[in-house]
Amino acid sequence: MAAVGAGGSTAAPGPGAVSAGALEPGTASAAHRRLKYISLAVLVVQNASLILSIRYARTLPGDRFFATTAVVMAEVLKGLTCLLLLFAQKRGNVKHLVLFLHEAVLVQYVDTLKLAVPSLIYTLQNNLQYVAISNLPAATFQVTYQLKILTTALFSVLMLNRSLSRLQWASLLLLFTGVAIVQAQQAGGGGPRPLDQNPGAGLAAVVASCLSSGFAGVYFEKILKGSSGSVWLRNLQLGLFGTALGLVGLWWAEGTAVATRGFFFGYTPAVWGVVLNQAFGGLLVAVVVKYADNILKGFATSLSIVLSTVASIRLFGFHVDPLFALGAGLVIGAVYLYSLPRGAAKAIASASASASGPCVHQQPPGQPPPPQLSSHRGDLITEPFLPKLLTKVKGS
């Protein structure tokens, strides 16, 4: 059943209808294309700026702020932002908002409690990022942190019964190889490093952060698929748990020091920039990625690695040697290959197979030729990245 005015209609429309039908898709396509490029720019800047800003804030001379307080402040701001967005969705009606939150958070308390697990892991992950970036160069961290793609893929296979293509498995192996080369370069020296840096602790923090990121992302995806709550509601619930759990972690790790020196000890404009980036960055990506496909996300990650490396050379005197360039290149290539939709991945695989020699493919008699992958609905099923799922849930 085709809708009226659908592009696939076989009826011959009148001249006016043809003109309208020809103009609207073109205008929509141009607007969508612009939004895709804006999405790419935003993703690149957000991916790179968070890492660089944390590194910059943690290496500034003077009093060093407490990382646990920054994590708590980011959760508070994120929760308040989601609350304002829900308030706007209720058209500024406080009564409707209160009734909605009472029903969604308190009455349906089972769904709320389910979010305690990913919230705990996300809070731990945010604290681990500070540990890792304080002990590793920003470019090294950015490359190594791409292991989260590997952990997310593995948890998706285990928890969601997803299947990966051969090209995706090969790209994961390529990713691991590239990260190993970068870490070998880091362990081998590569110039003097500050005395307060511990690359071993930084690597352990990155690996733990990648494991927690992969598990929490897939777990959160599973929750979103099994519930009807909006993305902003779920992020508000995450923010509530994140604030509470962050305060517990603050008290346990740095409670005495914070009580003595104050919650905002060591805060500078650079630190506030980190807090705002952490608070709004994830929400911004969740919205922006609606207009970006997985290829653009792969490009964004790859470009952010390049941007982080260039900025690290400029800001922190980072030295790029051939070993780092090789490892980073492998990671960038792996990210791009993994981000390809299944149809494109199969097309690349078939193209490489035909290029390796004469391909003798005999179609069984009586069977129709295989369908074109580019028109197959399965092309829309891409790799299990959480932001893509968020947009899918939003539109459902």
Curated annotation (Swiss-Prot):
* Listed result of changing residue 213 to A: No effect on localization to Golgi apparatus
UniProt-reported outcome of changing residue 188 to S: In CDG2M; uncertain significance
| Annotated phenotype, changing residue 331 to I | In CDG2M; in patient fibroblasts, results in reduced UDP-galactose transport into the Golgi; able to rescue defective Gb3Cer expression in SLC35A2-deficient cells
The record gives the effect of mutating residue 285 to A as: No effect on localization to Golgi apparatus
Where does this chain carry the motif ER retention motif?
392-396
Which GO MF terms does the UniProt record name?
Answer: antiporter activity; UDP-galactose transmembrane transporter activity
Recorded consequence of changing residue 233 to P: In CDG2M; reduced UDP-galactose transport in patient fibroblasts; no effect on localization to Golgi apparatus
Consequence the record notes for mutating residue 308 to F: No effect on localization to Golgi apparatus
Query: What, per the annotation, is the impact of changing residue 146 to A?
Result: No effect on localization to Golgi apparatus
Biological process terms from the Gene Ontology for this record are: galactose metabolic process; UDP-galactose transmembrane transport
Q: Where is this region: Disordered?
A: 358-379
Could you say what the effect of mutating residue 71 to M is? In CDG2M; reduced UDP-galactose transport in patient fibroblasts; no effect on localization to Golgi apparatus
Q: What outcome is documented for mutating residue 75 to A in this protein?
A: Partially rescues defective Gb3Cer expression in SLC35A2-deficient cells suggesting reduced UDP-galactose transport. No effect on localization to Golgi apparatus
One annotated Gene Ontology cellular component of this protein: nucleoplasm
Q: What is the effect of changing residue 258 to M?
A: Found in a patient with Rett syndrome-like phenotype; uncertain significance; able to rescue defective Gb3Cer expression in SLC35A2-deficient cells
* InterPro entries, per the entry: Nuc_sug_transpt (IPR007271)
Q: What is the effect of changing residue 148 to A?
A: Partially rescues defective Gb3Cer expression in SLC35A2-deficient cells suggesting reduced UDP-galactose transport. No effect on localization to Golgi apparatus
Task: Specify the effect of residue 145 to A.
Answer: No effect on localization to Golgi apparatus
Summarize the impact of residue 142 to A: No effect on localization to Golgi apparatus
Q: Which NCBIfam families match?
A: nst
**Subunit structure of this chain's protein:** Interacts with SLC35A3; the interaction is reduced in the presence of SLC35A4. Found in a complex with SLC35A3 and SLC35A4.
> What family classification does the UniProt entry report for this protein?
Belongs to the nucleotide-sugar transporter family. SLC35A subfamily.
| UniProt name for this protein | UDP-galactose translocator
Q: Which organism is it from?
A: Homo sapiens
Task: Cite the source lineage.
Answer: Eukaryota, Metazoa, Chordata, Craniata, Vertebrata
